[in-house]
From Swiss-Prot:
Belongs to the alpha-ketoglutarate dehydrogenase component 4 family. GO terms for cellular component: mitochondrion. This is Alpha-ketoglutarate dehydrogenase subunit 4, mitochondrial. One of its GO terms (molecular function) is oxoglutarate dehydrogenase (succinyl-transferring) activity. GO terms for biological process: 2-oxoglutarate metabolic process. Its main location: mitochondrion. Molecular adapter that is necessary to a form a stable 2-oxoglutarate dehydrogenase enzyme complex (OGDC). Required for incorporation of the E3 subunit into the E1-E2 core of mitochondrial OGDC, and acting as a stability factor for the fully assembled complex. It comes from Chaetomium thermophilum (strain DSM 1495 / CBS 144.50 / IMI 039719). Coiled coil: none annotated.
Length: 135
């Protein structure tokens, strides 16, 4: 018992923390927000199309492909819900594509659970150890 106490005391005396605190951080006075190429870029330059077509980020955002609330030119008849489903016509899956699992061939369908499997799920498998049998 005393040996364990002495061993623990020795471990705590030698232990040094892994975290080194470097002190309070300082905020730079000037922050450059101009577009920069990624440091791992092979060409070390931005694409020419980016610089020529987008003067600011807000201009880029206006021209970016958006399908949500960022797009400013949303029309009521565009996108999902713009026209009734009847106007879309019949929806048929292509050859080899199935919408429902029950449309698949028999070998790919879900197998029904046996009573033993249902019992194992409901009891957490405890009855299998009690009965001495496994699935």
């Amino acid at each position: 018992m005393f040996g364990t106490k002495a061993l623990r005391a020795a471990q705590h005396a030698v232990r040094t923390p892994s975290i080194k605190f470097i002190g309070k951080r300082t905020i730079p006075a000037v922050v450059d927000h101009t577009p920069q190429p990624h440091p791992a870029s092979p060409t070390k330059t931005l694409p020419a199309s980016f610089l020529s077509s987008h003067a600011t980020f807000s201009v880029y955002r206006d021209h970016a492909q958006q399908f949500g609330p960022l797009r400013k030119t949303i029309t009521p008849n565009a996108g999902i819900g713009g026209s009734p489903a009847v106007a879309l016509g019949p929806v048929e899956p292509p050859q080899g594509v199935y919408f429902d699992r029950n449309d698949l061939p028999e070998r790919f369908r879900r197998q029904p659970l046996t009573p033993d499997e249902i019992e194992a799920i409901e009891t957490g498998g405890g009855h299998l150890l009690y009965r001495g049998s496994y699935l």
